[in-house]
Amino acid sequence: MKTLAPSYLKHQFLIAMPHMADPNFAQTLTYIVEHNEHGAMGLVVNRPQELSLADILEQLRPDEMPPASTSQVPIYQGGPVQTDRGFVLHSSECSFQATVALEGLSLTTSQDVLLAIAAGVGPKQSLITLGYAGWEAGQLEAELADNAWLNCPFDPEIIFGMANDLRLEAAAASLGINLHLLTSQAGHA
């Protein structure tokens, strides 16, 4: 008997289904950074907070005035885990102290990336989050089996080229799905 290798969702999007009850994930689009037999990690990419890069820089360096342009750089709620920790998902032309190479992207957790972005010498494309989404071994698979999520291929244009309020619908549209037409009710024949 042939056993199938597990299928993991690293470098894909998770689209929260319209009936998602968890307020941490309702109406979210999540980029999956890692997914393996030990669990999964992702970053919610469509939930801006009431913070900007300027606010973060003021906390990191209270004696220095951040550049005015940093007040236009939003900070996203990456998920409910470690919400005081920063994660920067960015294009891969730059590397920093704590950078992990992903498929065509990089993820950095060190402050030097924030300073580079503020100075105008950072990555061409970036998305800054506080916190991340985490799943224990088998948890994400169970949620997928319960139809809490749809997965779709990653498209950098959705993160880096669209307004945050368009990202969820754009990811669903890449599958030919209109989220407004989905229901959580099953039909009976």
From Swiss-Prot:
Record-linked Pfam families: DUF179 (PF02622)
Matching Gene3D superfamilies: VC0467-like
Annotated GO CC locations: cytosol
Top-level taxon: Bacteria
NCBIfam families in the record: PRK00228.1-1
Family statement drawn from the similarity comment of this UniProt entry: Belongs to the UPF0301 (AlgH) family.
Protein name (database record): UPF0301 protein PputGB1_5045
